Amino acid sequence: MDTNIYLVLLRGINVGGKNIIKMADLKAGFEAMGFSNVVTYIQSGNVLVQSVDKDKAALITKIEKGLSKRFNFKARVVLISQKELAGIVKSAPEGFGADDEKFRYDVIFLKEPLTPKDAMKSVSVKEGVDSAYAGKQALYFSRLIAKASSSYLTRIIGLPVYQNMTIRNGFGA
């Protein structure tokens, strides 16, 4: 039976001393849910898994319920197939990630049903500091490192729409 590779992005773990989960425990949690070849990456909740299941909605429900029960917090995840991730990388705007000495780059992954078009309505950019671009499945955000403290990206964290987003940085060429 063919297996599918997925990237699972957890929201709000190991941030600000809340929802602390060791990566070995997180890996064991995914394995207990029946996923194979589980690999965690850094402490912010990036997990690669394999599954024979192709129903993303069912997988999201399974993962959120399983993690919520095992780790006693309301788990929220963004699930991205290998094909979708390749599309997100390919759809990045020209030059995105090309000058990591001058700019900080972030990809804002969206939890369905939030669309990039709708998410962009909540994203403010500060002229001369920030740039934002809506792709097909994610938002791409860059800001000048020298002026990062005046960036508007942090404003999104206080908005209700942020509950359906997760931001990952270091997305470079």
Task: Tell me what each language-model feature is.
Residues 2-44, 48-173:
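Surface-exposed, charge/polar-rich loops and edge strands
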